[in-house]
Amino acid sequence: IGFDAGEEETPWYGSVEKEDLDRFLTRTPMGNKGTFGKVLVLAGSGAMCGAAVLCARAVLASGAGMVKVVTEERNRTPLFCALPEAMADFWKEDEPLPEEALLQDLAWADAVVAGPGLSKSRTAKELLVFTVQHTEVPLVLDADALNLIAEDAEILSGCRAEKILTPHVGELARLLHMTIAECQRDPAESAGRAAEKYQACCVRKDSVTVTAEEGREQYYINTSGSSALATAGSGDVLAGITGAFAAKRQCEKNEKKISLAKTAALAAYAHGKAGEAAEEKSSASYVTASEIIRGLQSI
């Protein structure tokens, strides 16, 4: 069903529909690049520029008006060659963070994505801590951001932003200090447990993706996608889509906003439909993350 869940004492299970995507994928003729959402992406160590590129490219392909990437200095040339539409700021490993620039970037953004390819280095952790402490718009935490938080939950102390966690089952197991098998027994329960523990919305990625929200036994079960999504970089793409949708939600008037959980569920649904579209053009075995991004055009 394609509507927000009501207040119920018993667990609620629902899903979103393709028509629900119109609010994020349809543009008003009177808008501009600022009103369609500005997304800040903190991603990419020196060895993982591709994660930053895929995430940022997915942001723009999902309808956001602008994207800025904060990445390691060694990624400067490959980033601009791969994605000339992006703006960027840079940090250097084992050097002080560019805090003034980061504060300006965070104030500029309507949503922030942190983690794809970031690494778990000392400087990457400092960057994540600084971001968490100074972000007031929706914050999507993925990949290495989740791995760092699993090792040190205090990273999130003092966070004022709404949070969306996007773990695959391995990352979820680390976040909950459980085994993968334990996390797979009850997908909704494990997603809900992470949402409660980290006071966030949790998108538990697996063959069936489940989205849970803190404080509510309400679960969105994703109905799109296929094994085509099981490819390197696919999670970076989902993080970008989620950031774009969260930014668009942030730009909406309060009376029109949907829940953060439904926003995240819609991103997972769009990701799945894009994978389906990519699979139709080749086969599940040959789909790449870049093709998933191109598949967004067919939704």
Regions found by a protein language model. Give the residues of each.
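Small-residue (G/A/S/T)-rich helix-start motifs and N-terminal tracts that mark the onset
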Residues: 1-138, 143, 147-164, 169-299
